[in-house]
Amino acid sequence: MSDRILFLSNGSICYDSTTYFINCIGEELKAMGWEVMHIRLDKATQKDKLCVLADEYDSQPFDYVFDINTKLDAVCDDSGRYCFDRLGKAVWHYILDHPFYHHDSLNVPLKNMNVICLDRNHKKFIEETYPHINKCIVLPLAAKQAEGGLKPYDMRDNDLIFTASYTDPDMVYFKAKKQDSENVDFFNTFTQRLFDNPELTQEEAIRQMYPGISGVQTAEKLQENFMADVYIQAAIRQEIVVQLIRNHVPVKLYGHNWDTFLMKAEVLMKEDLPFIKEFVKDCGEVMYGELPNIYNNARLSINQLPWFKAGIHDRTPLALMN
């Protein structure tokens, strides 16, 4: 009998990227002879549906449960039992961010929880912080080549693309400043430490600030102050495009909210206004499944790693494949 896997998802995030990844992984498993099921759970009714699955677990035709970036691990029935434990199946939880973003899920003491992550440092942090997790492996996300094959390099329309959402770091900073004084002090110290020492991981910076802190306390500290991490990523993303403009490198921007950046740049970078209007193009949001064709029509792409120090971001194989 072939292996059988159930994919669970609850909602569409990041340009429907998680659904795209699940579909791609499912296609590969089917090609290997696996039986694949995919259930999409509405967040309002996910508890009820998981409980139904748990009630009928003996008759459920699957061996593994797989999800990407969900918080389903923590869903309990009315008696307080975790639905995933009641299923009696091995659970594989694929996380695409730093583990602290998933602390509430990873901290759930499921009987057979397994984790896939993208970075070797993330794996080490998970193994040290959540000893109840049965297994943790590092497996980067692969990529698809554009349909129809590779477009000849000299026939591509775009010289440079950048695919990412824009978040105004100034707005994140102002929001962070409205917190209590302790969190503001943490925000300032933590962000500056990482900017000054970009080789550090988030957890290494925390351990320097709080010697002797435990893994769980580190995750809780980072989770409580997640805006500090958001600010760092937003500031780097903005600086990438600012430097492209200052050096007059044409670029096409794909993603949410770049129109906000361009309005800001037109005010603060008036000396570059003619260049911005002609050579910096906001192409708007696109679904993740459109990216292979977009990359296949560009000669170069820029990728911003989300502070991974020992891992690969999905946009890198996407560029390499196209």
Segment roles from a protein language model:
Residues 2, 9-21, 129-313, 321:
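Nucleotide-sugar donor-binding catalytic core of glycosyltransferases
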Residues 4-12, 18-129, 144-149, 283, ...:
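Extended catalytic core of nucleotide-activated donor transferases of GT-like folds
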Residues 89, 113, 158, 249, ...:
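Residue-level detector of short, conserved catalytic/binding motifs and their immediate flanks
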Residues 110, 117, 270, 317-321:
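Alpha-helix boundary/capping detector
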